[in-house]
Swiss-Prot record:
Name of the protein: Protrudin
Compartments where found: Recycling endosome membrane; Endoplasmic reticulum membrane; Cell projection, Growth cone membrane
Protein residues bound to Zn(2+) 1: C343, C346, C367, C370
Topology of the protein relative to the lipid bilayer: Multi-pass membrane protein
Source taxonomy: Eukaryota, Metazoa, Chordata, Craniata, Vertebrata
Record region (Sufficient for homooligomerization): 1-92
Gene: ZFYVE27
GO MF assignments: zinc ion binding
Changes after translation: Phosphorylated. Phosphorylation is induced by NGF through the MAPK/ERK pathway and modulates interaction with RAB11A.
Main location: membrane
């Protein structure tokens, strides 16, 4: 220590000799190996080849857990539960020894008993070993190498994004950012510890296996599909009758009469042109008024029943046709056709945004702004019980007349 301090601070050293000493004491920089991104990509692909058996095993496990073949998944779940519950300690040691010895024996037989094949034969068969050798001796052009590097970087970025998302979720649970999730996590950990302490290991493994197979969404989807198919097989007649059954008729003679009404012919269409183009918000209000007034002015239903009893089925059809024709005529008188396509009050042209609306009292065509007054149907002479509650649209002049 003292000699070094003297060498650094002593006045004997001349200034001319200092740079030479520092140059001699500097270490010679070693040449760092160049980073080859293409070799990194090749190493990644070789790693994929080596891990391909594990990837296939993971795909098989996911195939069973997703119940894509329900019978295989069910047999696997039941078989594993039976093994977990019935095997004793000696049997488990035997299973472990078997799982170690079988891969070792297969690898020895594949390597020792296989005949040495030529290069052309290996290229023809395209085994995994050939793929590894191809990756070691691969020669690619510059565009192909750039494409491989880009693909590798994309996969690496996706992997790092998933890892970052997992770490962020773990930190959110540990920092209690969401108390519900954190409480569920720690509750599950405490429950697992208690279960490991109270239950035997075989029961713990059986419960874990049952949770993996029966606690996912795919299992409930398969169960719902099978339940629906069983219901269709057991009750085919009820479904057919449900599709073919007519809608329920109203109580009283009027409902039965309306149900028996035949479909009107094109000459007896009940929807005039002005009613077809009315606003879709309340398409049936105007028809209810006309039908109710027609029912009030129609002859007594008892007289119609007497005529039907006297004249038979043909007279019944004639009565129905006459009733439909009277209703059609009343609708045509009530809703005159306006061929000009403009509002009677403000002369605004109807369009997609400017809807037309019929006044329920005078029958003229207005826009939705001019025909925006609502009055109860009872003010127009309707006597039905629901007429006190239901309202219809009328124009301003009709609103003043009906409000007096």
């Amino acid at each position: 220590m003292q000699t070094s301090e003297r060498e650094g601070c002593g006045p004997e050293v001349s200034p001319s000799t200092v740079p030479e000493a520092t140059l001699e004491s500097l270490p010679v920089p070693t040449k760092l190996p160049a980073f080859d991104l293409f070799n990194l990509v090749l190493s990644y692909k070789r790693l994929e080849v080596y891990l391909e058996p594990l990837k296939d095993a993971g795909d098989g496990v996911r195939y069973l857990l997703r119940w894509q073949t329900p019978l295989c998944s069910l047999l696997t779940c039941l078989g594993l539960n039976v093994l977990f519950l019935t095997l004793n300690e000696g049997a488990w040691y035997s299973v472990g020894a078997l799982m170690i010895s079988v891969p070792a024996l297969l690898g020895y037989l594949q390597e020792g008993c296989q005949a040495r094949l030529s290069e052309s034969e290996l290229m023809r068969r395209k085994y995994h070993s050939v793929r590894q050798e191809d990756l070691q001796r691969v020669r690619l052009s510059r565009p192909e190498a750039v494409a491989e590097v880009k693909s590798f970087l994309i996969q690496l970025e996706a992997l790092l994004s998933r890892l970052c998302g997992t770490c962020e979720a773990a930190y959110r649970v540990l920092h209690w950012e969401n108390p519900a999730v954190s409480s569920q996590f720690y509750g599950a950990l405490l429950g697992t510890v208690c279960m490991l302490y109270l239950l035997p290991l075989c029961w713990v493994l059986a419960l874990l296996n049952s949770t993996l197979f029966l606690g996912n969404v795919e299992f409930f989807r398969v169960v719902s599909e099978y339940r629906a198919s069983l219901q269709r097989r057991m009750n085919p007649k009820q479904e057919e009758s449900a599709f073919e059954s007519p809608p329920p008729s109203d109580a009283g003679g009027k409902g039965a009469l309306v149900d028996c009404t035949p479909a009107p012919t094109p000459t007896e269409d009940l929807t005039p042109g002005s009613v077809e183009e009315a606003e879709e918000a309340e398409p049936d209000e105007e028809f209810k008024d006309a039908i109710e007034e027609d029912d009030e002015g129609a002859p007594c239903p008892a007289e119609d029943e007497l005529v039907l009893q006297d004249n038979g089925f043909l007279s019944k059809n004639e009565v129905l046709r006459s009733k439909v024709s009277r209703l059609t005529e009343r609708l045509r008188k009530r809703y005159p056709t306006n061929n000009y396509g403009s509002c009677t009050g403000c002369s605004a042209t109807f369009s997609v945004l400017k809807k037309r609306r019929n006044c329920s009292n005078c029958g003229n065509i207005f826009c939705s702004r001019c025909c925006s007054f609502k009055v109860p149907r009872s003010s127009m002479g309707a006597t039905a019980p629901e007429a006190q509650r239901e309202t219809v649209f009328v124009c301003a002049s009709c609103n003043q007349t009906l409000s007096k």
